[in-house]
Amino acid sequence: MSEPLKPRIDFEQPLQSLDEPVLKSAQAFDEQAAEKFYPAAPELDAEDEEGRVEGLVNAALKPKRSLWRKMVTAGMVILGASVIAQSVQWVNQAWQQQDWIALGATTAGGLIILAGVGSVVTEWRRLYHLRQRAEERDIARALLVSHGVGQGRVFCEKLARQAGLDQGHPALQRWLASLHETHNDREVVELYAKLVQPALDNQARAEISRYAAESALMIAVSPLALVDMAFIAWRNIRLINRIAALYGIELGYFSRIRLFRLVLLNIAFAGASELVREVGMDWLSQDLAARLSARAAQGIGAGLLTARLGIKAMELCRPLPWLEGDKPKLGDFRRQLMNQLKNTLPKKDKTAH
């Protein structure tokens, strides 16, 4: 038997029609506007901000070329030309008069001058390479927002040669195998930053961790503050030299001083807020006084300063800017330092008893 029909249902209000979405009018971009478009990159904006602060600091500390400075430079140039002319005249007179002693002395002095000029040229070349690394980072920033094709691969292959990576290196082989003819410059540089650059960054991180641990242990176990200061200064200079060598930069005397100065300026002016943000609250929440002695806490502080120095040296020596999530954090090194100190100091106490 069939079921009875349901009664009719009357609605008090009429059914509301669904509102159709309002679509914006289509916008057409020409080729010139499309070339200027690039996605937002907060990490690159942060890099640009740090570079701007560093540039302002360097401009403020750079001595202005006054009139007296120009006069001294002109006088030194004239004096150098006069010395060269007088030396040529002495050599000519000694040769004509057969004064072999004067001729030998003049020749020895000329060789010393040539050696000094060669050293100056070598130092200038190394300083130029250090300055060129900053220009390469600017080129990399431009390529990371570029839609062009062809320049990214040439640029990355140049970076690989500077780093001493041959064609048989596994990371370089993976990068070459990942490339496709449809990739633009931004994608090529990003692949290089993710596949090849970490091979060098991991070595630099290991060096920073080792040097920071040595500084922390030295402060924790040594009772002599003067010896601690000298040791940390020496190890920090060694760390900067090591990081520069890993990234293919050969440092001379003046280039080493310039790099060390840039690192310290960057830490003092651009890194204070970041240091507080990464370590400050987490440091207070650890209650270090309950876990370690005051001397060990001082060692952790010295180790963190060494790690901070190494991170900024990495930033100045890397040919590429930091991408999102690539930059080392002090929190990682802090945890390593605490674990090493907790494992080392009890052993020393047991051996002492």
Curated annotation (Swiss-Prot):
Membrane topology designation: Multi-pass membrane protein
Keyword RNA-binding set for record: no
Any coiled-coil regions, as ranges: none
Location(s) in or outside the cell: Cell inner membrane
UniProt keyword list: Cell inner membrane, Cell membrane, Membrane, Transmembrane, Transmembrane helix
InterPro entries found in the cross-reference section: DUF697 (IPR021147), UPF0283 (IPR006507)
Protein name: UPF0283 membrane protein YPTS_2342
